[in-house]
Amino acid sequence: MNCVCRLVLVVLSLWPDTAVAPGPPPGPPRVSPDPRAELDSTVLLTRSLLADTRQLAAQLRDKFPADGDHNLDSLPTLAMSAGALGALQLPGVLTRLRADLLSYLRHVQWLRRAGGSSLKTLEPELGTLQARLDRLLRRLQLLMSRLALPQPPPDPPAPPLAPPSSAWGGIRAAHAILGGLHLTLDWAVRGLLLLKTRL
């Protein structure tokens, strides 16, 4: 029996084409995703996060009314005025938007940790906001990769944010963070829609 097996192997080795099963036929080359569709998806996520931020800011105002402007020196300044939208270029917009949103993500995480007991009632909404910010950041990273844009250098470690000096300080910080994030996302939607027309 052993000899028969060896004989079969020898015979098969004489005709290698019959011994090796052919592989699957080569398919059509993979089509890279349309960057306009990727940009559409990013705009939808940004609009959704803008609506969430607007709603959470309204809840905060209802629970803790606070007149006037609220600022945090550690927050990024608004990337661009609405009047300067015409001069935008895609690489700069995506890089700046990613950097600003990373800063806001860090501030939302800080607010959840150090905002004080008054803000605990908004914890579920702040958690959802943090998760959606993270999702949008991943989408921006994917979009930059699909467009073959140069990857930004790693961000240097940011200094830790000091805890609010009082419960009221935490509330004012929340107003500043949500207000700034709202303006940034509104600017981002306008800028991304304009840039889509140039792709």
From Swiss-Prot:
Annotated site residue numbers, Important for interaction with IL6ST and for the stimulation of cell proliferation: 168
Record keywords: Cytokine, Growth factor, Pharmaceutical, Secreted, Signal
Localization: Secreted
GO CC annotations on file: cytoplasm; extracellular region; extracellular space
Top-level taxon of origin: Eukaryota
GO function terms (MF aspect): cytokine activity; growth factor activity; interleukin-11 receptor binding
Main location (coarse class): secreted
Region (Important for interaction with IL11RA and for the stimulation of cell proliferation): 182-190
Segment forming the signal sequence: 1-21
InterPro entries assigned: 4_helix_cytokine-like_core, IL-11, IL-11_mml
Keyword Secreted recorded: yes
GO biological process, one term: fat cell differentiation
Pfam families, A to Z: IL11
Quaternary state and interactors: Interacts with IL11RA to associate with IL6ST, giving rise to a multimeric signaling complex.
Family to which the UniProt record says this protein belongs: Belongs to the IL-6 superfamily.
Function of the molecule: Cytokine that stimulates the proliferation of hematopoietic stem cells and megakaryocyte progenitor cells and induces megakaryocyte maturation resulting in increased platelet production. Also promotes the proliferation of hepatocytes in response to liver damage. Binding to its receptor formed by IL6ST and IL11RA activates a signaling cascade that promotes cell proliferation. Signaling leads to the activation of intracellular protein kinases and the phosphorylation of STAT3.
Name of the featured protein: Interleukin-11
Gene (UniProt): IL11
